């Protein structure tokens, strides 16, 4: 791992992994998970992958919706340890978002919960998502939403965060990245500081 943002994220989340749900970040992301839970459409036996899965809480929640094959990817090995404990029947991988350990056109549903602003190269992530998601498959991104003026103020400084934050995005920026990589916009929802972007693989 040679990216400073990835290293910062890994160090930060390794420290808080054991009690993540009780930390500020853990509590902050509850609403993101709840919004994703309501929005995600999972069919029986779908292959579902949560990128930057953390302790696997979202995947655990999604098991209430349908029977699926669950996978998670996260850069923090300590978070992956917790995810395996929480979801013993699922498979988890330590890694970043730019090399997703799946074959071409293998995934039905992909989720990203409050993590997109940590990705060092979102273009590369979108390319990988396009590679591994089936035609007609879906990606759901629940991300921090800041009004334009706050993005202008925060973005020059957020990259110095010890937690590995890189940039806060507008919904149009996120959509454009994925439209340039073979996705079409399905829907956008806003709820307070959460933007939920749903895209479909063409």
What are these regions (language model features)?
Residues 4-8, 23, 58, 140-181, ...:
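C-terminal alpha-helical "lid/dimerization" subdomain adjacent to the S-adenosyl-L-methionine
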Residues 47, 136-138:
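Short glycine-centered segments of the SAM/dcSAM-binding site in methyltransferase folds
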Residues 49-51, 55-99:
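Class I SAM-dependent methyltransferase SAM/SAH-binding core
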Residues 111:
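A conserved beta-strand element that flanks and buttresses the S-adenosyl-L-methionine
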Residues 123-135:
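A short glycine-rich, Lys/Arg-flanked "PGG" loop and its adjoining helix->strand segment in the class I
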């Amino acid at each position: 791992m040679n990216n400073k943002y990835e290293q910062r994220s890994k160090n930060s989340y390794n420290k808080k992994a054991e009690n993540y749900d009780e930390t500020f970040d853990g509590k902050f992301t509850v609403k993101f998970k709840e919004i994703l839970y309501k929005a995600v459409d999972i069919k029986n036996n779908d292959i579902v992958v949560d990128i930057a899965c953390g302790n696997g809480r979202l995947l655990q929640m999604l098991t209430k919706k349908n029977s699926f094959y669950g996978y998670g990817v996260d850069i923090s090995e300590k978070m992956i340890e917790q995810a395996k404990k929480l979801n013993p029947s699922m498979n988890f991988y330590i890694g970043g978002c730019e090399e997703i350990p799946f074959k071409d056109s293998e995934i039905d549903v992909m989720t990203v919960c409050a993590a997109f602003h940590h990705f060092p190269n979102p273009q590369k992530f979108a390319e990988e998502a396009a590679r591994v998601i089936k035609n007609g498959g879906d990606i759901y991104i629940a991300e921090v939403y800041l009004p334009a003026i706050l993005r202008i103020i925060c973005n020059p400084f957020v990259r110095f965060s010890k937690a590995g934050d890189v940039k806060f995005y507008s919904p149009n920026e996120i959509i454009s990245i994925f439209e340039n990589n073979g996705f079409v916009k399905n829907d956008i929802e806003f709820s307070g500081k959460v933007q939920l972007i749903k895209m479909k693989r063409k």
